[in-house]
UniProtKB/Swiss-Prot annotation:
5-phospho-alpha-D-ribose 1-diphosphate binds at E113, D114, I115, I116, T117, T118, G119, K120, S121. CDD domains: PRTases_typeI. Orotate binds at T117, R145. This is Orotate phosphoribosyltransferase. Its cofactor is Mg(2+). The gene is pyrE. It comes from Helicobacter pylori (strain Shi470).
Amino acid sequence: MDIKACYQNAKALLEGHFLLSSGFHSNYYLQSAKVLEDPKLAEQLAKELAKQIQEAHLNIECVCSPAIGGILAGYELARALGVRFIFTERVDNTMALRRGFEVKKNEKILVCEDIITTGKSAMECAKVLEEKGAQIVAFGALANRGICKRVHSHLKAQEGACLPSHLPLFALEDFVFDMHKPSSCPLCTTSTAIKPGSRGN
């Protein structure tokens, strides 16, 4: 399955000057919501991701995603794996588990995002779950921005990667674009970064 073509065909690979949720600036932005608005395509992508996870013989009892971006991807992945789905959300800028969701002690959970850049949001989600007694066994995403190391990729973890090296990251594709710290972003000399939809939006 050509993941890059899926994003291009859905007009989900945007070009411009963007402020990513990780804090980095980039000339490209992946808008997974445009890909996932097609239920059949969302199901196909989730099944492809689930196949990787199943081949790794991991025991996963639940999928959890940080809201809002990860919810559709996480729900479809949980459906493909045949496990329950929950999500965390921000309350006063702090990640929390609400809406009656609970986790069992030592429940094995995979944290799923639509896109993994540094993995910061995924780790905030994981921390909430671990504090409630759950066991994080893996991370998943439709796409990886190339900072974190994923299973089946030759790319190594880069500076800024937040995901722990001892847990696997499963993703369908690496999208490696130039990313800049705001203090040294060359794009800022000619334009202002826009935030197309993530934290605080």
